[in-house]
């Protein structure tokens, strides 16, 4: 009886425990997608804190279901840090829709201005020091912290509360009175971070702008006198008259761009395009360009909409032991250096009228004494503060204190009479200006109106995994090599090398974000791009539902057929069909297979038909993980022999799905990887597919795991992994041609040295035999790659909106292989011999020997392999010697038989050299059968060639054509 009572108690207790239980996978996905439970109209508020592991947790900070009643409403709410000890914010995930929210600011402080669920921000943000940790603006990319970088919170000096401020601009989206739960999800860790984030504020305080069209430059410069800081993001800020704001590091007279942006575009933090480090003795310089057009009076620096501001916020990190959390620069200590400022700093960035950000500031008060505005400080040009002061001055960037009234309230009676007073005045001006930005819901037209401007200057990155690179002390230009360039030169075997085709004009096409490239049966290049649509942090909600449906489909042709020689557009299609194009592949019949991550669908298109898709897989705008749904599918591969369809499904589901040629679901495999050392068959964004028909394999670019996985198409059995340290942490795309595998990686993470580049690999061994980069422009996010069988390679970049063409430096006819014809077998077999030798000797020494042999044997301009030349010279000599011996040895009566045998024998040899003949000498099999040589690692030479009839048995064929076992994953 006692046992029964115990069991009853357990049953009563356990259900509640089961409700709260979450598997590690669900916790991971929950943080990735959302950290709150949604119900009815709005996100719930039941579980703001979600454990990730023993040291990390997610904190969800969201509005508790609010409905603004008038435009330009600012709501604030607070969440207490769920711990007293020190922690570090290492990532931010915005949870806002551009249709409802204009911008969001996240502050840290020790006492919020109110203890209610939410309040009007007119009441203030915090009653003590407030620091800005995060800023999000519509149509702008989210702020990302590099790996190892964190903002300090908690502990003795850090903030105890987070305060979220949300600005609702145009409230027409709330006509249905729905509730809004916009906010931000934080990823925090208890582990000390080696690098601490901070802010450097450059601000002009004495600029005077006369009325009229005269250009006025407001210059700021300071000597940097601290430990090195590494810049990774920036934000510009002016009012209506600002045309462009530019920031630079000046070292030994050399100007290095930190950031340049129009202040009339969304004023969030943007990543620096190239890493910049600032060391002791450098000069930091900034210029704001103004005109007084439309004004009838002189304009000064101040806090109302009639005044102006010139601010550049530089977000940086420093080593923890030397970290200074906040620094300021408010003077121009080196005015002479601006004589050599790059001309770009003086060129306004044009912004269409429908793209201008409206600034809803308080109008100038009638009794305002303009002469009492901020005056030139009489302090050291650069102030450095410790942790506590950092929070005080960070609040001045965009925050509020208890005495702050909504939007740019400026008290002219409070003159700056001392250094501390001046800094306080600056703080009030900065924080209150940003509270006043308003919105007129022009978002849909902003991107559409000037696509190139938005794409090139705002959306320089596409997904959160595109982390920022380490800062380096160099000036980068389009023609200069990137960090780490050329480090793979010793690995070039000379066997295959590609270089950019500098005479190809296609690099200047500049379509939208290039998501896919492929080659049609006529060898024309086909580009799949996003037009004026972009994929950024605002595109999807936490459940992967597309949030910008109101923009409508892309109103321009998204599929371009390009002449491979002169880059002329031969054909275009795909208008008003897609929202966010992603993958593109072309089957043997020339049909296009495309994916759209917003629609969560796969389409089969006939390029010659205008009747719509031939086949559609998935449900429009409905993410899911069953047999009838996808969730942001990335790529498609179609088996040329069977017509079987393979889909990589993709960003959310981490699986591969197989369909019949008619679109019937067959099977799926794969799962999400949560560990640092993922297992075979686990994925973190299966991003690109490449079929290897001769071997019956499907290879997958496992993007976020930085590797390539190959599987058998019939059994789905894992075959091998290809992973190299030079890949870095991402492999975005792959392409296969007989014997070779091409790939492109992604932008390196913080402290990683691997550059963004393309790779050529021996498919059998997986060894890298060449790397390549463009000369014109540079890779930023190479998103897809396509290779033709003559060795021409095309790479499309989603950030630079560029397509490059690379060609082989060899005579490609010696490596050409026809899809449905006779191959030049002797070339393939000679390569097989070389590959076999390379497997049996150390790679480095063997590569040297191969290079030396090729140098000795090759004549200038010749690409003929040494083995081929030797074969062509030796065989006729052997045949002639054999004939002479037979003539001398045989009598005249036996001569006829000998002649017939010789004729048959020589016919087989010469026939083999022509790639014909059903039997005879097979150099690959001959050498592979000799002691000391292994057949393992050979490529299947052809599916149509006569060699296939010579396979002795199934087991031997399997050994010859299976890939080697996966090598141990390198530590990272």
Curated annotation (Swiss-Prot):
Locate the region Peptidyl-alpha-hydroxyglycine alpha-amidating lyase. 495-817
Q: Name one GO cellular component term.
A: transport vesicle membrane
Q: What does this protein do?
A: Bifunctional enzyme that catalyzes amidation of the C-terminus of proteins. Alpha-amidation is present at the C-terminus of many endocrine hormones and neuropeptides and is required for their activity. C-terminal amidation also takes place in response to protein fragmentation triggered by oxidative stress, promoting degradation of amidated protein fragments by the proteasome. Alpha-amidation involves two sequential reactions, both of which are catalyzed by separate catalytic domains of the enzyme.
Q: Which residues bind Cu(2+) 1?
A: 102-103, 167
Q: Which species is this UniProt entry from?
A: Bos taurus
In Swiss-Prot or TrEMBL terms, this protein is called Peptidyl-glycine alpha-amidating monooxygenase
Q: Where does Ca(2+) bind?
A: 517, 584, 784
- Identify the coding gene: PAM
**Disulfide bond positions:** 42-181, 76-121, 109-126, 222-329, 288-310, 631-652, 699-710
Q: Which residues are glycosylated?
A: 762
According to its UniProt record, the EC number is 1.14.17.3, 4.3.2.5
Task: Write out the transmembrane intervals.
Answer: 874-897
Instruction: Name the residue ranges with Pro residues bias.
Output: 963-972
Q: Which parts of the chain does the record assign to the membrane side Intragranular?
A: 31-873
Compartment annotation: Cytoplasmic vesicle, Secretory vesicle membrane
Please tell me where Zn(2+) binds in this chain. 582, 687, 783
Keyword ATP-binding found: no
């Amino acid at each position: 009886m006692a046992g029964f009572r115990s069991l009853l108690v357990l049953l009563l207790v356990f259900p509640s425990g089961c409700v709260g239980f979450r598997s590690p996978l669900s916790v991971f996905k929950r943080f990735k997608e959302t950290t709150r439970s949604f119900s009815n109209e709005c996100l719930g508020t039941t579980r703001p804190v979600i454990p990730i592991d023993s040291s990390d947790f997610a904190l969800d900070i969201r509005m508790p279901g609010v409905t603004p009643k008038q435009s330009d409403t600012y709501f604030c709410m607070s969440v207490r840090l769920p711990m007293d000890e020190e922690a570090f914010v290492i990532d931010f995930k915005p949870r806002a829709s551009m249709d409802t929210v204009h911008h969001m600011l996240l502050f840290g402080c020790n006492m919020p201005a109110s203890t209610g669920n939410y309040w009007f921000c007119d009441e203030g943000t915090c009653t003590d020091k407030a620091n800005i940790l995060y800023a999000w603006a519509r149509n702008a990319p989210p702020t990302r912290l590099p790996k190892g970088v964190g903002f300090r919170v908690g502990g003795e000096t850090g903030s105890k509360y987070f305060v979220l401020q949300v600005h609702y601009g145009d409230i027409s989206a709330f006509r249905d009175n729905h509730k809004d739960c916009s906010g931000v999800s934080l990823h925090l860790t208890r582990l000390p971070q080696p690098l601490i984030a901070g802010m450097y504020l450059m601000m002009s305080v004495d600029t005077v702008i006369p009325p009229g069209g005269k250009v006025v430059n407001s210059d700021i410069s300071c000597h940097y006198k601290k430990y090195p800081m590494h810049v990774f993001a920036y934000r510009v800020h002016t009012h209506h008259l600002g045309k462009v704001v530019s920031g630079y590091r000046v070292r030994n007279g050399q100007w290095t761009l930190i950031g340049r942006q129009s202040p009339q575009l969304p004023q969030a933090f943007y990543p620096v395009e190239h890493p910049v480090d600032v060391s002791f003795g450098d000069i930091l310089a900034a210029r704001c360009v103004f005109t007084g057009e439309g004004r009838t009076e002189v304009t000064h620096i101040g806090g109302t909409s009639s005044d102006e501001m010139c601010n550049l916020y530089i977000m940086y990190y420093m080593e923890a032991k030397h970290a200074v959390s906040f620094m300021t620069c408010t003077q121009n200590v080196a005015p002479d250096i601006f004589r050599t400022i790059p001309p770009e700093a003086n060129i306004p960035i044009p912004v269409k009228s429908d793209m201008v950000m409206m600034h809803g500031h308080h109008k100038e008060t009638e009794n305002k004494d303009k002469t009492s505005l901020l005056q030139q400080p009489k302090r050291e040009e650069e102030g450095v503060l410790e942790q506590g002061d950092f929070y005080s001055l960070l609040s001045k960037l965009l925050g509020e204190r208890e005495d702050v009234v909504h939007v740019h309230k400026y008290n002219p009676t409070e003159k700056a009479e001392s250094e501390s007073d001046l800094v306080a005045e600056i703080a009030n001006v900065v924080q209150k200006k940003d509270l006043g930005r308003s919105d007129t819901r022009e978002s849909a037209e902003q991107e559409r109106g000037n696509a190139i401007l938005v794409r090139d200057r705002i959306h320089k990155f596409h997904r959160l995994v595109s982390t920022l690179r380490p800062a380096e002390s160099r000036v980068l230009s389009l023609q200069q090599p990137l960090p780490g360039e050329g480090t793979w030169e010793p690995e070039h075997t000379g066997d295959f090398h590609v270089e950019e085709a500098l005479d190809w004009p296609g690099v200047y096409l500049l379509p939208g974000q290039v998501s896919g490239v492929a080659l049609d049966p006529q060898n024309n290049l086909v580009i799949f791009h996003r037009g004026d649509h972009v994929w950024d942090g605002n595109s999807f909600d936490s459940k992967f539902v597309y949030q910008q449906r109101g923009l409508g489909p892309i109103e321009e042709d998204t599929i371009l057929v390009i002449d491979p020689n002169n880059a002329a557009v031969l054909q275009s299609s795909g208008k008003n069909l897609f929202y966010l194009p992603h993958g593109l592949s072309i089957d043997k019949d020339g049909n296009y297979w495309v994916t759209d991550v917003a629609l969560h669908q796969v389409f089969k298109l006939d390029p010659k038909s205008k009747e719509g898709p031939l086949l559609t897989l998935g449900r429009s705008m409905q993410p899911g993980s069953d047999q009838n749904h996808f969730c942001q599918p990335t790529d498609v591969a179609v088996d040329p022999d069977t017509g079987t369809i393979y889909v990589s499904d993709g960003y959310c589901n981490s699986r591969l799905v197989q369909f019949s040629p008619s679109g019937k679901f067959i099977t799926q495999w794969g799962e999400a990887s949560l560990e640092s050392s993922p297992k075979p068959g686990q994925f973190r964004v299966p991003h690109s597919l490449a079929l290897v028909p001769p071997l019956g394999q499907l290879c997958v670019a496992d993007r976020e795991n930085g590797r390539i996985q190959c599987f058998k198409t019939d059994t789905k059995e894992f075959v091998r992994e290809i992973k190299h340290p030079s890949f870095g942490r991402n492999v975005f795309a792959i392409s296969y041609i007989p014997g070779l595998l091409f790939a492109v990686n992604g932008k390196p993470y913080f402290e990683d040295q691997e550059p963004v580049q393309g790779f050529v690999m021996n498919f059998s061994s997986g060894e890298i035999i060449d790397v390549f980069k463009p000369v014109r422009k540079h890779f930023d996010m190479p998103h897809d790659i396509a290779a033709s069988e003559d060795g021409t390679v095309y790479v499309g970049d989603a950030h630079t909106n560029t397509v490059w063409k690379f060609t082989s430096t060899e005579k490609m006819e010696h490596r050409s292989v026809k899809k449905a014809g006779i191959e030049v077998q002797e070339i393939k077999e000679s390569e097989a011999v070389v590959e076999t030798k390379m497997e049996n000797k150390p790679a480095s020494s063997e590569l040297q020997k191969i290079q030396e042999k090729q140098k000795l044997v090759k004549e200038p301009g010749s690409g003929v392999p040494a083995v081929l030349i030797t074969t062509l010279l030796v065989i006729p000599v052997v045949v002639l010697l054999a004939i002479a011996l037979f003539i001398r040895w045989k009598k005249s009566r036996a001569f006829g038989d000998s002649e017939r045998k010789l004729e048959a024998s020589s016919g087989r040899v010469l026939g083999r050299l022509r790639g014909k003949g059903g039997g005879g000498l097979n150099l690959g099999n001959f050498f592979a059968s000799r002691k000391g040589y292994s057949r393992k690692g050979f490529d299947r030479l052809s599916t149509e060639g006569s060699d296939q009839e010579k396979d002795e048995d199934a087991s031997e064929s399997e050994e010859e054509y299976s890939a080697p076992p996966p090598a141990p994953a390198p530590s990272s």
